Amino acid sequence: KNPDDHGISFLNGLGEVTESYTIGSLVEKSYQLSLYFQKFKPKGKRFLLLYNQGLDFVIAFLGVLFSRGIAVTAYPPRDKKHIPRINSIINDCDPVALLTSNNLSKKIDKWLDNQIGNDKPLIATNNLNLESSENWKRKSYSSQDIAFLQYTSGSTSDPKGVMISHAN
């Protein structure tokens, strides 16, 4: 595909485009983040993504996939009553890092710090100084490898992780 082709747009409540990005800009930022994740030796390791909807989530999700890690998606806690769900997910999936955006990181850090004795790094991915993507190399993977985990709501019991492979 052409890097200048349309990649993704975000709309406001009226259906008007508020942000739009090309495939090239999405891929470049995702590759850069993928290179950053190499310090975690990411192959098959889980990264918990705690983002609001938007570009930061898309780039982090793709960055984890490009690094051969496993993205674990969850809504960030809106208030203290949602902390037990996040704790349950963290305990179940044992992520190597918690990823979020700069505007959520302080709130999440405050909520989670005392809850689980969290020793996992909380990384605001849109606030990193990332290297150029020119050193990025495609990683091979099997279609049967797990791409991401999607957790159930946990409304009737602890959230359960559903494994989604690259083939799905």
Question: Model-predicted segments: where are they?
Answer:
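Internal alpha/beta domain cores that form substrate/cofactor-binding pockets in large enzymes
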Residues: 108-121
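Conserved pre-ATP/AMP-binding loop-to-beta segment of ANL
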Residues: 3-6, 123-124, 132-158, 163, ...
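Short beta-strand elements of ligand-binding domains
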Residues: 51, 75, 119-130
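AMP-binding/adenylate-forming
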Residues: 70-72, 87-102, 147-149, 163-168
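Conserved AMP-binding/adenylate-forming core of the ANL superfamily
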Residues: 8-58, 78-87, 133-140, 164-167
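Conserved ATP-dependent adenylate/AMP-binding module captured primarily in the ANL superfamily
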Residues: 76-111, 131-133
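A short helix-loop-beta submotif of the ANL/AMP-binding
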Residues: 47, 54-77, 88, 92-97
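A general structural motif
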Residues: 3-5, 43-44, 95, 119, ...
